[in-house]
Amino acid sequence: MKVLVLFSVLFLTLFSYSSTEAIDELDSDAEEDMLSLMANEQVRAKACTPRLHDCSHDRHSCCRGELFKDVCYCFYPEGEDKTEVCSCQQPKSHKYIEKVVDKAKTVVG
């Protein structure tokens, strides 16, 4: 009976050791996969369109201001040409809110 208990304890110890090594290998593989996916995602990220530049090619590509993302506004300029012109602009409400936040930061500290 003592021999059976001794072998069962030895078996359980070896089994737990082998399972932890297998889990560690899976974790390291998962970390490597995640790092490669993050590297690919950074390569895919496209540059944003700065304020007052043309955004007609991609209307959702405007850069962020301090607090808010700029908005792509489209309009038709006066004159002979009837083509639509789009540019990234900061809405006035966002501009005023950013000014209030800046003033509050200087007052508070």
Curated annotation (Swiss-Prot):
Secretion signal span: 1-22
Gene Ontology CC terms: extracellular region
Subcellular localization: Secreted
Propeptide segment residues: 23-44
SS bonds (residue pairs): C48-C63, C55-C72, C62-C88, C74-C86
Domain remark in the UniProt entry: The toxin is composed of 2 domains: a highly rigid N-terminal inhibitor cystine knot (knottin) domain and a rather flexible C-terminal linear cationic cytotoxin domain that forms amphiphilic alpha-helices.
Family: Belongs to the neurotoxin 19 (CSTX) family. 05 (U4-Lctx) subfamily.
Annotated function: Enhances the high-affinity desensitization of human P2RX3 purinoceptors.
Identification of the protein by name: U4-lycotoxin-Ls1a
Organism of provenance: Lycosa singoriensis
Lineage, opening ranks: Eukaryota, Metazoa, Ecdysozoa, Arthropoda, Chelicerata
